[in-house]
Amino acid sequence: MALIEQLVARARADKQRIVLPEGTEERTIQAADRILADGVADLILIGNPAEIAKLAQDKGLQHLEKATVIDPLDHPKKEAYAQLLAELRAKKGMTLEQARVLVENPLYLGCLMIKAGDADGQLAGALHTTGDVLRPALQIIKTAPGITCVSGAMLLLTQATEYGENGLVVMGDVAVTPVPDAEQLAQIAVCSAETAQAVAGIEPRVAMLSFSTKGSAKHEDVDKVVEALEIARRLRPELKIDGELQADAALVPSVGEFKAPGSEVAGHANVLVAPRLEVGNIAYKLVERLGHAEAIGPILQGIARPVNDLSRGCCVQDIYTMVAITANQAIAAKAR
């Protein structure tokens, strides 16, 4: 079964409540109709109900009546959510009046619903920047226990089935933290492993990437990767993780055996952790374009409950897939 089909099947089996705060956006509406038709998730659309109804009628969408539609300007829990936000941000000086204004912002409203237990995850970004999507998530939902660093992982589905997990590789960070320190890099590794388990459904074998393998080069950047490996092992002693490894030593069995003999990860890695954002971002785009891989994501990780960000150039299928991914993350978050 293809990865997307697996994600959809798991989501259907344990339906999660996913908020789409850009509820009047055309691609979002079309994806929502497909999601509801297929039973992938219980959707909460935030937006003007009349506008959503008109869009549904104009596009001939038959399943949107299954969604919960919330008007951000007029709904029963508006005051309760405002009080919750004011409490959460009291140390930052937020007043109740300021909170009442922010609650009318769909991105804030969706995150407050998650915090209050009224929803399980959120997906946005068709109309908003990554910063717009992340800001309320970090202010309201906050990072996961023991995690201070948010990052983004990409699923790369390649035709090179001899590498990774039958051609599937998870790569992080590709989206959020430009120059992680050793502690942050360790957290990126741990969170990328969790994404591999929760979303890809695979047992992670994590390689901490570098231009050096096991001391073949000396540099402060290599030292940071080695330190991050030690921290990651303390955070997750049971995790299969090794480094520092060059990309070929991480992926190619013969090279891994030669350069890092005795490693249970070298030559068999299915999770690749880049030492800095520019490396991860450039690498995944090269694999996608030159290697004709399918790139799915980025999948935000490190937040206590799933909030994901779309590209503003996304298509209907991208939104459909990311809802399924967000639902799988929500299932995993509840199980932790």
Label the model's feature ranges.
Residues 1-266, 271-336:
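Anion-binding alpha/beta catalytic cores of soluble intermediary-metabolism enzymes, centered on
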